[in-house]
Amino acid sequence: MYHKYKNVELVKPSGLELKDRLVSVNRVTKVTKGGRAFGFSAIVVVGDENGVVGHGLGKSKDVSEAIAKAVEDAKKNLVKIPLSGKSVPHEQKGKFGGARVNLMPASHGTGVIAGGAVRSVLESVGIHDVLSKSQGSSNPHNVVKATFDALLQMRSAYTVSRQRGISLEKVFKG
């Protein structure tokens, strides 16, 4: 999933204090000739609240086992997100499936203006001041992936100056 982004820094979970947030648990049913077989799927976001975040999906016949599998999956997908203080560096849009997410920087003290799955991802990253708008599909899995799409497109001012071969001052003042 992350190969289409050039500047994605994959992170190993060892040595990080990761906190996990449960985004959703869904009860699923498989109908067989012997009756119904119930199972659960869980979506979890893990992060160190300092720019490192990952998401995972776990499935099992037991809720706690599904959550544990999701946490393990999330730890395999950790990425580093560039932050601007405790907000996002610039406005960015992300898409996945039918879900679209817009993230906009906010001034200090604004808080996380986001709902559901988007809020879980942003708080796990360590973003404290951001405005967001979620449109289209409200499926938690697609919304989480759309939020990751937006976050992975973010670039810090330093990265932009290096890529363009200009000074950091010129990036800010034009």
From Swiss-Prot:
Concerning InterPro entries, the annotation shows: Ribosomal_Su5_D2-typ_SF (IPR020568), Ribosomal_uS5 (IPR000851), Ribosomal_uS5_bac-type (IPR005712), Ribosomal_uS5_C (IPR005324), Ribosomal_uS5_N (IPR013810), Ribosomal_uS5_N_CS (IPR018192), Ribsml_uS5_D2-typ_fold_subgr (IPR014721)
Under SUPFAM superfamilies, the record lists: dsRNA-binding domain-like, Ribosomal protein S5 domain 2-like
| KW RNA-binding (keyword) present | yes
Record domain S5 DRBM: where:
18-81
Cellular component GO terms, alphabetical: small ribosomal subunit
- Quick one: a GO biological-process term for this protein? translation
Annotated keywords: Ribonucleoprotein, Ribosomal protein, RNA-binding, rRNA-binding
List, in alphabetical order, the Gene Ontology terms for molecular function in this entry: rRNA binding; structural constituent of ribosome
Domains (record comment): The N-terminal domain interacts with the head of the 30S subunit; the C-terminal domain interacts with the body and contacts protein S4. The interaction surface between S4 and S5 is involved in control of translational fidelity.
State its role: With S4 and S12 plays an important role in translational accuracy.
Q: Which family does it belong to?
A: Belongs to the universal ribosomal protein uS5 family.
Q: How does it assemble?
A: Part of the 30S ribosomal subunit. Contacts proteins S4 and S8.
Q: What is this protein called?
A: Small ribosomal subunit protein uS5
Q: Which organism is it from?
A: Flavobacterium psychrophilum (strain ATCC 49511 / DSM 21280 / CIP 103535 / JIP02/86)
